[in-house]
Amino acid sequence: MNNARPIRRALISVSDKTGIVEFAQALAERGVDILSTGGTARLLAEKGISVTEVSDYTGFPEMMDGRVKTLHPKVHGGVLGRRGQDDGIMEQHGINPIDMVVVNLYPFAETVAKEGCTLADAVENIDIGGPTMVRSAAKNHKDVTIVVNAHDYDRVITEMDANEKSLTLETRFDLAIAAFEHTASYDGMIANYFGTMVPSYGENKEGDEESKFPRTFNQQFEKKQDMRYGENSHQAAAFYVEANPEEASVSTARQIQGKALSYNNIADTDAALECVKEFDEPACVIVKHANPCGVALGKNILEAYDRAFKTDPTSAFGGIIAFNRELDAATATAITERQFVEVIIAPSVSAEAVEIVAAKKNLRLLECGEWTTKTTGFDVKRVNGGLLVQDRDQGMVSEDDLQVVSKRQPTAEELKDALFCWKVAKYVKSNAIVYSKGDMTIGVGAGQMSRVYSAKIAGIKAADEGLQVEGCVMASDAFFPFRDGIDAAAEAGIKCVIQPGGSMRDNEVIEAADEHGMAMIFTGMRHFRH
């Protein structure tokens, strides 16, 4: 049985008019009758395309400032009518079949994102007729084609030309899926917006506050790739991304070469890239199992890589390397000659570096593009039966935010190192301890249940690599509940500590620092990472 359906009549009504004139012209040239509404109809007519206004077709005018345009039985009957089953009733009521619906919706997201948008503005950008037509056409995809995305226009025309002006059921079904995804996303945005409104009907009264967290949490992600497996080989997995991510990230990165990214590759690459974004100077971050094992700055990325690698060459094997500058030939050569690496990611990659890395055909090389500022958004964590939602941790301190609480003031060099290792500690799993000196990590202690043991591990790692802890700065992602961590740090040779403060025993901890002649800096900001 031939499941192709010819396109003889199309209804076109779009808010985003990208490519619509060319698409409508192509349909008209193929003998398709075009129905349209409002601004779309005027635009097509101005371009010399023959078009019938929906109001002329239905005999019912647009009204209520355009709120009622397509909500009419002659429109929805033409879209929903089942060919071969409803033909008689359609003919009885003068309803012509509509074979294609081309609709995208009022720009609700763009409207509410504008500064000064009122609830009234938002309400007037809630599309009613559009989603109704989209859902009607998608429901009746057995007979009707629905097109909601401009990037599908060329695909439709190409298939019509190859298939006697018809489209297959497979194509109609695929376009119907896109349509339901489109309306689901649209309704989710509206629900999120209204879900953050204060009880006083959108009018802020004294004492009212808007919540940034809606009553229901609606977000839509598009599947970018299926994976061989997840975190472990017995777990199925896929990678989903935001529809239009604004910030350079692992989600937006272009893979230049190498094997397909695994679940763990993506998680680790995200950790490495987000950490390296914290630095303005040329920087390198090496990550293993989502923890930085080496971070350093340099006069160029080759020097930064060399110094980051020295922190923990053992853990760097099979790791992820991220840079905040273009990957050049010299750095690519140093990496490929020195170590096995799973992924390299950088804002850009030189042509010479691409050629060098090509010799390691399995190495995954990613180019993510430049970034300027970080976008706001939510972090989510799945728990059994629920979802934890919070702001992204974009908190960071400057020198002006720091409070020196010890008798000894930090030197200028210690202060610089303190700010450096504080940035690193933010990306180390709690309990996190970082030793650093000269804009280079010396030891990293991650993920221990006891903060003092994280400090011990940082010292052990430094000793294993022959790195000198004496004179280092220590960063802790959270406060020290007891003085034992400070005593252990002093014994290891730490001269300056940066930490949030806020413990019930802060006075005891500060006393310990003073006893050991250490400088201690409070940030007033914690960076737990679980």
From Swiss-Prot:
The UniProt keyword set, sorted, is: Hydrolase, Multifunctional enzyme, Purine biosynthesis, Transferase
Xref: CDD domains: IMPCH
Q: Which SUPFAM superfamilies match?
A: Cytidine deaminase-like, Methylglyoxal synthase-like
The alphabetized list of GO BP terms reads:
'de novo' IMP biosynthetic process
Q: State one Pfam family annotation.
A: MGS
Q: Which reaction(s) does the protein catalyse, per the Swiss-Prot or TrEMBL entry?
A: (6R)-10-formyltetrahydrofolate + 5-amino-1-(5-phospho-beta-D-ribosyl)imidazole-4-carboxamide = 5-formamido-1-(5-phospho-D-ribosyl)imidazole-4-carboxamide + (6S)-5,6,7,8-tetrahydrofolate; IMP + H2O = 5-formamido-1-(5-phospho-D-ribosyl)imidazole-4-carboxamide
- Supply the gene name: purH
Q: In which pathway does it act?
A: Purine metabolism; IMP biosynthesis via de novo pathway; 5-formamido-1-(5-phospho-D-ribosyl)imidazole-4-carboxamide from 5-amino-1-(5-phospho-D-ribosyl)imidazole-4-carboxamide (10-formyl THF route): step 1/1; Purine metabolism; IMP biosynthesis via de novo pathway; IMP from 5-formamido-1-(5-phospho-D-ribosyl)imidazole-4-carboxamide: step 1/1
Single GO molecular function? phosphoribosylaminoimidazolecarboxamide formyltransferase activity
Keyword Transferase, does the record have it? yes
Q: Which Gene3D superfamilies match?
A: 3.40.140.20, Methylglyoxal synthase-like domain
- For this entry, the protein name equals Bifunctional purine biosynthesis protein PurH
- MGS-like domain mapped to chain residues: 1-148
Q: Which InterPro entries does this entry report, sorted A to Z? A: AICAR_Tfase_dup_dom_sf (IPR024051), Cytidine_deaminase-like (IPR016193), MGS-like_dom (IPR011607), MGS-like_dom_sf (IPR036914), PurH-like (IPR002695)
Q: Which GO terms describe its cellular component?
A: cytosol
Similarity comment: family membership: Belongs to the PurH family.
